[in-house]
Amino acid sequence: MSQRFTLMTAALLAAALVSVDALAATASAGARSYEDLALNGAGDRVAALESVNPPDAAKRAHASVVVRDAGSGKVLATYDPCPHCLYNYPSWSPDGKALAFIGNDSHSGNAMLYLASDGKVRAISTFKGVANTARWAPDGQRLALLATVGARKSTGATQAGAPQVGEIGTDEDEQRIALVPRSGGALKLLSPEDTFVYEYDWMPDGSGWVVTSAKGNGDNNWWVATLGHVDAGSGALRVLAAPKTQLNMPRVSGDGKTVAYIGGLMSDFGSVGGDIFTVPLAGGEPVDLTPGFNGSFNGLDWRNGQLLATAQMGGEQAVLAVDAASGSRRVLWSQQAGVGTACEGCVSFSADGTRAATALESFEHAPHIVAGRLPELAAITHDNDALPAHVAVRSISWTNDQFTVQGWLLSPLKVDAGKTYPMAVIVHGGPAAAVAPGYVTPGKSTRGLIHDLTAKGYFVFLPNPRGSYGQGLTFSSANQRDLGGGDWRDILAGIDAVEKVAPVDDHRLALMGHSYGGFMTMWGVTHSQRFKAAVAGAGIANWISYYGQNGIDQWMIPYFGHSAYDDPAVYRAASPIESIKAAKTPTLITVGERDVECPPAQSVEFWHGLKAMGTPVSLVIYPGEGHSFQQPASRADERARTLAWLDRYVK
C-alpha cells in the first residue's frame, strides 16, 4: 500500500532521532531558556526557571530555580532539590527573604511545595498528585497553591488524557485551593470539592481569594468559568460575575473593592488575549475598561491604585499603565519581541510598579532576561549572546476584506538573486492565539522545524489571520461562525502579498499546522489545489463527530453559537470531510494517541477519506502523547517525517 497507517513503537521513535537531529542537537546545546520569572518586591532580585538544552536530543531539558541580582545578573542562588521534578512559578515572600515554588515529580507521583532562603531549600508539604501556582498570603505566614490530589493526569487539556476505561465521566480531577503554613504541614483543602479552580488572587487582607472556576471537568469547562470569591475560613464560594466570554488573570485592587480581569473570546486556557474588565467585589455586571483597544492584553497586575498590563499590539509586546477609573492608558515600554513563556503575565513587576523584568527573544536572537526601572529595561544575562541568527525575518502586512492582517516571513540567511524558493505556510494553533517572535534554533519543536526548513532553502510564512490576537476584540472574534471562511481568505491573500515582495515559487508551496492549524490544513487541501504538500497535526476533519469525541466541547459554543445538536448545519459547513472529494494534495497527518483536544479519531477519519480518494497520505499516531507532544523523540520523529514529506512532494 502506498498509504501508511502507523502506530509508532518506542523503539522506532528512538531510532528515528538520527535522521534530523544528530547535528542539530549539537548546534543547539548550551542555549539557555528562562521561564516563570518573578521579580521580588524591592525589584533587586529576580528568580526564574532556567535550563540548558542538552546535547542529546532524546533527553528533555531539566530546569533549576535560579536567583539573580536584578541589576548585574549575577547568580545569587540555584535550587534544584528534585532531579525528576518539573518546577513552576517561583513566588517571593512579602518581605523578600524567602522563595516558594512547586515541584511535580513524575517518577514518584508526588507534588512538593518548597521553601528556599539563604541558599537552603526544604519541602514544607508533600502529597500524591499535582500542584501549581504557589502564592504567599499578605502576612507572609501562609502559602496558597492549586492542588489536584490523586490526579489521574497532568493538569490541562493539552496534556495526555487519562485512559478512557470503565464507567466514563464519574471520576473527575478537581483542582482546589489549598493552604500550607510557612512552617510546613499537610495541605488544607479549602475550595469546594466539586469545583475546578483555574486561577486565583489573594484578597489584600488575607481573608480569601478571587478565583476563576467551574464545576466538573476542568479540561472541558473553562470556557464557561465564572468569577468568584472563596472564603479562606469556610471555603465557601460566591459567584461575582458570569461573563459570556472567557476570562483570565483575576486581580484584586489594593483596597479590596474591585476585581480586574482579562476577558474576550479565547479558545484555550493559557492562551490569553482580550480587553481589561472590572467588576465590584460585591458582584455585578463586568465593565469593559478598554473598549476599542487595538491590541490584546495578556498580563495584568495592580500597583499603587493603577493597573499595569502587558499586551500584544500587532507585532510588538508592550507594557501599559491603565487608569482603573477612566481606562485611559499609556505605553510605558514596547518592543518587537516575544515574552510568552517568561512568566504568568509575561512581565513581572516590583511592589511599587516602577521596576520590571522579563525574558525577551526574537526570531533572530536567543532569550535573555531584561530588568530595570521602566521604561529602561536592560539585558542582565548574556549566556546566549554568542548564539547566531539562523534566519532573516520581516513583518508582512496586507489587507483583506475590511481588515489589515499581519504575519511574519522568515527566509534563509542567504538568498540568491534571480532564484525562486519554495515556501511553507505554517498556521498557528488556537484559533485565539498569534505568532510572536521566538528564537529559531535547531531542535526546538516548531522553531526547530522552521530552522530545518530555512536551512533546506524554504521561505516560511507565519500568518496571523482574523481570529488571532494582537488587533483588538473585533479582529479576534471575526471568525465566529466562519471558521474556514474569512480566516482562510486572509491566509491566501497573505501568500499573494508575500509573493509580491519575496522570490517565492507559487508552484512549490506547502501548508501545515497543528490543532487549529491542523484543521486549517485539512480545510486548505479540500478547498485549494495550490499546495504541493501538506502536514496536518492534530486536526479536525468533521466538526459533527468531533463534538462528541473530544474532551473540551464547551470551547465550540462561543465560536459556533450553538451546540452541534442544536445547529448541525454550521458545524457541517466548516467540516473539511464534506469536501473530501476535492482533496488531491499529498498529506502527512500526525496526532497523539491520548489527545483530549483533537482526538486521533479525527485524524483517522481524514486519513480514511484521503485514502479512499487515492490521494497520497500517511498517518502517524504517537503513543502516549497528548495534544502537546512531550517526548523529545516524538517531536524529532514528527519533524523528520515532515521534512521528508516536503522533500518528496515539494522540492
Per-region residue spans from a language model:
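A flexible loop/linker signature enriched in serine peptidases of the S9 family
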Residues: 50-65, 80-87, 100-113, 126-132, ...
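Residue-level detector of Asp-centered blade-edge/turn motifs that repeat once per structural unit
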Residues: 41-42, 94-95, 138-139, 204-205, ...
